[in-house]
Amino acid sequence: MCKIIAIANQKGGVGKTTTTSNLGIGLAKQGKRVLLIDADAQGSLTASLGFTEPDKLEETLATVMANIINDVEMEDDYGILRHEEGIDLMPGNIELSGLEVSLVNVMSRELVMRSYIEQVKERYDYILIDCMPSLGMITINAFACADSILIPVQAAYLPVKGLEQLIKTIGKVKRQINPKLSIEGILLTMVDSRTNYAKDISALLIENYGSKVRIFENSIPISVIAAEISAEGVSIYQHDPKGKVASAYQSLTEEVLGNE
């Protein structure tokens, strides 16, 4: 049984891509078959996994979705790249921006990505979708096929306030398109545990959302290393396996596995 998790927040810079890659590789280290989908036109996930020029790739999520719209048949492994740390990747690039515009005129436009996932999900235990920092049509496609949504939130006051709109959108998709959709949990990222501020934000999250939404027990500490690994094309487990960020993502992986 494949579980599909969208990693989403309409605010950028909150650790979505880092969380997608390190959670995905963490799951693979536990013996799970994992597909990561880069659903962001910036191609940040693709680049961070070592495919440093995503805009030069000819087979990407945009071409997959265009093929589905145009009824073009594809092999199951069309476009999939394999990473040395045991995960598969469906890359994304700038072509997703153009596709998002063209989706407006497509019948069942919210369900194009779901058609692709139905085709490949038998081969995986987990599919993680790195969403773009907006609530546009590509992100709605991700929500329409996900079982759950994991929301990374930077430990700062304003991003926490922005959660309200995202949670409302998730509720709307659940009512209108995807009744099985749930929130996997809220993950605090870039936490500086030396400050009281981070503790205040954590308390604010629990106060506002704790009764409705799971707040992950583990949070991701702020770290220069997390930024460095994007340039190396490897996960935190390979770059700094004994560090606090690797330990935090390992704990997050165990929490997600415990939520199966």
Residue map of PLM features:
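P-loop NTP-binding core
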Residues: 1-260
